[in-house]
Every structure is written in structure tokens, then in C-alpha cells.
Amino acid sequence: SDSSIQEVVIMSGAQLGKTEALLNVIGYHIDNDPSPILVLQPTLEMAQAFSKDRVAAGLLNSTPCLKEKVRDPRARDSGNTTLHKIFPGGAISIVGANSPSGLASRPIRVVLCDEVDRYPASAGSEGDPIQLARKRSATFWNRKIILVSTPTNKDASRIEEAFERSDQRRYY
């Protein structure tokens, strides 16, 4: 919540809680600081699975204060779908990095990029999906961009490159 920090990079081993950290950010913003949120997954299929398994079934259904703020997509006139959920003061859009239409046209304050080393080089012919997502937050003075991933190939890893550009804090 420190407005002086706009970007956070988490480079970590597999299955060590990176995605869980993103879910906590989502829950915080739904409940305490409503904002437009974009969650970027490597593919549209992974976005759908993340929304169903982690956001809806895990986060929302197991947290009463969040469940009452985000209506079930099956509810009449909820305005919610699997990949887009509205809550008072904000919304969350969950998209695939391979889908240029999901990365266009809406202002986003909180950008959450999961498993960035699995993203395609370009979202269709539109360009780098991380840069496209970053542009969505340009108008917010208090934006947050969080990149998380397990690194893949040295010197070809998006998360390694982002970590090298950061102040490289380590928490033990």
C-alpha cells in the first residue's frame, strides 16, 4: 500500500506461494481499496482455470467478506462472468497474455502478472503483453504492477530481467 512503490518483482522457486501472494492482493483490493484489477495469466485457458479454481472456488467462496461483495456469475443480472468480476468500486479482469483484446481499452490501477516466463513474446501482433498491461495503468498515480514467476532459462527470462532492474531485495 506504499504509493511510492509502483512495481514489485517476485522471482522465486516453484510452488512457494507466489500466486497465493497475488490472491492476497486481489482480496485486499476487493475489501479495502477497491480498484480496477487486471490479472494476466500465460494463456486464456490458464486464465479461465485460475478464475474458476483459485479466485472463485478458493478466494471468494472461502472468504465471507469477499463473497458478499462479488456476486456469483450465475446470479441473475450480476454482470459477472468467469473472466470479469465486478465489485463495489472496482472490477477484476482475468486475461491471457496471448489475447490482445484482453489487454486493450480499459484503465487498470492494479496489474498482476503471474508466471511471466511462460508468456508469449507478443500478444498476437500487438507486442509484449507485459508492456501492454503496463500501459493500462499509466494514468494512475498510485498504480501497482506486480510481476511473479519461477525463472526459466538464464539470460532469456522475463522475471530475471525484471529482477535485475529492481533493487533486488531479498527476504529470508
Model segments located where?
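Phosphate/NTP-binding elements of NTP-utilizing enzymes
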Residues: S1-Y172
